[in-house]
Amino acid sequence: FMDTIYIIILTILVLFVCIFIYLLCSSEVKYQTTLKRNCLMAKIVSKYTYKHIDRYKIDLSWWKDKPVEKISINSFDGLKLQGYFLKANTNNFAVVVHGYGAKAMEMQQYVKLFYEKNYNILTFDNRGHGNSQGKTITMGYYDYKDVQTWIDFLIKKYPQCKIVVFGLSMGGATVCMYSGTKKPKNVKAIISDCAYSSSYDVINNIANKSIILSIIQTMKAYNIYLKYRIGFKL
């Protein structure tokens, strides 16, 4: 009799876990909460974005006639990161950091702005994005260290460079995190555009819109998973 009870309890627990995973992996919430780079829902935009899709189209034709040099570095934890460099005849440099789910080339309008002001341009695919390695998007937690590495790369190659660091959305949060570090004197300015102050609050707000996810306290479970698999918590 007790064996039957144990089997029933175990079955219920397994079912509960399966439902939890399904909700994270199949619902609209997944797009907002996933940190996996190849997730199916990461390719799906929100209903609002889809409704106004013309506003979000990105024309990449500006890059076609530009002498872009592809460069790469190794991150502190051994990932190969892909960067793109546009040279100008000046000591002014702009490091441009993209946001969640984007790629370096999609920062075209910001790159264009700096380039037309005669800045050398370094933009790159964040870890877990584009042509850079990494299975996980770290919401700035490790990315700001990558910014440090890219800047060290520039300074080593161009000792007299004067650097402006610009970040958008998750990139904005990343450069904010970088701003709290001990920076080389070459870094003259940091610009953060529409950053979040807390990735935990952003994801928690989305999760709480689902009754089931709010009941099972998604963020507590999610942070346990992140700490175990990736080494940090939101």
Residue locations for each model-derived region?
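Hydrolase active-site cap/lid region
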Residues: 177-234
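An N-terminal hydrophobic leader/cap segment in hydrolases
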Residues: 12-74
